[in-house]
A protein has these predicted regions:
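Conserved beta-strand in the GNAT
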Residues: 38, 44-53, 62-64, 69, ...
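Conserved beta-strand-loop-alpha-helix junction that forms the acyl-donor binding cleft
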Residues: 71, 100-110, 129-131
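A flexible loop/linker signature enriched in serine peptidases of the S9 family
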Residues: 57-58
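Conserved GNAT acetyl-CoA-binding A-motif
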Residues: 91-102
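Amide-forming acyltransferase catalytic core, primarily the GNAT-like/NAT-type
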Residues: 2, 19, 116-204
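Active-site rim helix/loop that mediates acceptor-substrate recognition in acyltransferases
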Residues: 6, 12-42, 46-54, 162-185, ...
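Conserved acetyl-CoA-binding loop-helix of GNAT-fold acetyltransferases
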Residues: 67-72, 76-90, 112-116
Length: 209
């Protein structure tokens, strides 16, 4: 039912995933079924909030909205807001201190709902995409002073100091560890010292870090 509900709720959005991709996404984002909630009609999920749980802000236990959606024919009934209100006592009882979510800026309906619930915008993300055949890599023409080697996720734990920003929830080191073999990690070694790295999904082309 989870995949059917997700596919139906996002059928008119710029989101398209198959069952395998949804499973990988939920695993990577720390999906917790016991702390996720839905609205049902005739035993079918018509609206839902899938929550991921982890330590994000200053090590505090945080819930992350992995996906909130409502089937088109059930929109306009305030189901998302009712689900969120219903979930709060359960999340607090589980020790959740923060609730984090992301929303597309042009989704004015969702923005209005979240603002009415007391959410504040902390930062904005840019999202870039390109067809792989149109990506131009000028670096391949230059002599390399480093060697590229395959790494494991634990190999980059000490390299988090390389960041000049805080990655989003789904790109955070904890999400990378949860993803396991769904992601590939490559490191740039100079004199056997890690000088840079890249984490990506070979299936989707997503560059994680």
């Amino acid at each position: 039912q989870i995949y059917t509900a997700f596919k139906s709720a996002f059928s008119d959005y710029e989101i398209s995933v198959d069952k395998t991709e949804l499973k990988s996404m939920l695993k990577r984002r720390g999906f917790n079924p016991a702390l996720s909630f839905g609205a049902f009609y005739d035993d079918n999920i018509v609206a839902f909030t899938f929550n991921g749980i982890g330590k994000y802000y200053n090590g505090k236990l945080t819930a992350y909205d992995t996906g909130t959606g409502t089937r088109k024919e059930f929109r306009g009934q305030g189901l998302a807001k009712r689900i969120f209100t219903h979930s709060m006592p359960f999340l607090k009882n589980a020790g959740i201190e923060n609730y984090l979510l992301e929303v597309l800026q042009h989704n004015k309906r969702a923005l209005k709902i979240y603002e009415s619930l007391g959410f504040e915008i902390l930062r904005e993300f840019n999202f870039f995409t390109q067809k792989k055949q149109l990506v131009v890599n000028h670096l391949s023409d230059k002599p390399a002073k480093c060697s590229i080697v395959a790494l494991k996720s634990e190999d980059i734990l000490s390299a988090q100091s390389f960041h000049d920003f805080t990655p989003s929830w789904q790109n955070d080191i904890e999400s990378i560890k949860r993803a396991g073999d769904d992601l590939v990690t490559l490191g740039a070694m100079v004199d056997s010292v890690l000088s840079g790295y890249c984490v990506f999904s070979p299936k989707s082309g997503d560059i994680t870090q």
